[in-house]
Amino acid sequence: MGVWWEMITGQSTWWYTNDLSSVRINETNYDELEPNDSHAANNKKVMRYIDFAAQHGFDALLVEGWNIGWEDWFNKKKDYVFDFLTPYPDFDIEKLNNYAKEKGISLMMHHETSGAIRNYERHMDEAYSLMNKHGYKSVKSGYVGRIIPAGERHYGQYMVDHYICLLYTSDAADDN
């Protein structure tokens, strides 16, 4: 079960604000921007989905769009689009994980790479540490878009090596 159903059906957005045409990770201050009121991965909606999941026998909930960068993530060929660490101002990662745990639900982490593999690998250790800190037990890694660097393919050797790196990194993070 996932919050993303609202997004793919056009009821809500992955992004927090409509005020940006370009995001600069570690420079864009989301606290100074006006929320668009259609961002799906917010505390209120996620808690509602957690309640639904608990009531209907689900054990986990996937939450896409929780982290900064979604305003210009797709088809821009940006190497540095997400940091996999910084939630939007309306997503309290600790509060939501505690709430989910009280209801017997696990939140599933989402790491959309937008095809920027070097960027994901650059942040992987910290991203998995954040997951461990907050009790996440699983992650869905996304690879929407063309793979960066240019010329690489989703199922070429470059990506096979990346997937192997993912396995080793996640296993090592799980041991900590």
Which role fits each region the language model picked out?
Residues Y49, L96, A127, L166-T169:
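Aromatic/hydrophobic pocket-lining residues that form π-stacking "cages" and hydrophobic walls in ligand
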